[in-house]
Amino acid sequence: MFESNHRRLWLGGTVLIGAMLGLLIALPWFPMASSGKTVQLEFLRSEPDQALLFFGFPGCGEICPIAMERLHAIKSNGGFPIPIQVGLVNIAVDLPAFTVSEYAHSFDPEFAGYHLDQGKLRSLAQDLGLNLPATEGGISTSFSHPDALFLLQHVEDESWRLKQIFSATRLTRQQLLKSL
């Protein structure tokens, strides 16, 4: 009797500790910006007035290909119900600017790639509550980064309002339709 109770307590404690560690490890990757926040995005066109922004890099071996393929699949299978800009913001600032553009176009010719300098990238990530690890000195293909996909709406001039944050690797067309 004592042994079975002890074993249950041990298993329960192990599960609880594992869940807490998982949360502590994953928490920094979750964006903390709330919808309604306004950010300055001088690199986006004012039309169409809706945009989906994803942060990643060419050569990513895990998250980026899945996210970009998912966006392409949603666009190809029924499309977006309204015109939307889809952009990939490069987090590997040491790569040449044309590389991110070519990478985005490889998934869909209408997808755009944006290469910001380190200061603008950090500022934008901070505005959106995105915790990006330091990337100086290059990024390996096994580098893990958040899969946050930001839905934004143009307000005026270079101002965009954050409408919704999605998981880019798990986004469905239905989720997107509900938010537009």
What is each of the regions a protein language model found here?
Residues 66-124:
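Structural microenvironment flanking redox-active thiols in thiol-disulfide oxidoreductases
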